[in-house]
């Protein structure tokens, strides 16, 4: 659970970041989720 604050911050950054379209935003979101799972594997 210690990666939860990091994950929340990343989600806020994604939500506030201007995106060209929703598809690009979704791809970025998936990349960050994969990174979180690889870095903090105990959270998945």
Curated annotation (Swiss-Prot):
Signal sequence, renumbered to the chain: 1-19
Modifications after synthesis and translation: Contains 2 disulfide bonds that can be either 'C1-C3, C2-C4' or 'C1-C4, C2-C3', since these disulfide connectivities have been observed for conotoxins with cysteine framework V (for examples, see AC P0DQQ7 and AC P81755).
Subcellular location: Secreted
Location (main, coarse): secreted
Keywords: Cleavage on pair of basic residues, Disulfide bond, Secreted, Signal, Toxin
Annotated S-S bridges: none
Positions of the propeptide segment: 20-29
Keyword Metal-binding (UniProt): no
Pfam families: Chi-conotoxin (PF16981)
Molecular function GO terms recorded: toxin activity
A GO term from the CC aspect: extracellular region
Highest taxon of the lineage: Eukaryota
Tissues and organs where the protein is expressed, per its UniProt entry: Expressed by the venom duct.
Domain observations: The cysteine framework is V (CC-CC).
Family, per entry: Belongs to the conotoxin T superfamily.
Name the UniProt record assigns to this protein: Conotoxin Sr5.5
Organism, scientific name: Conus spurius
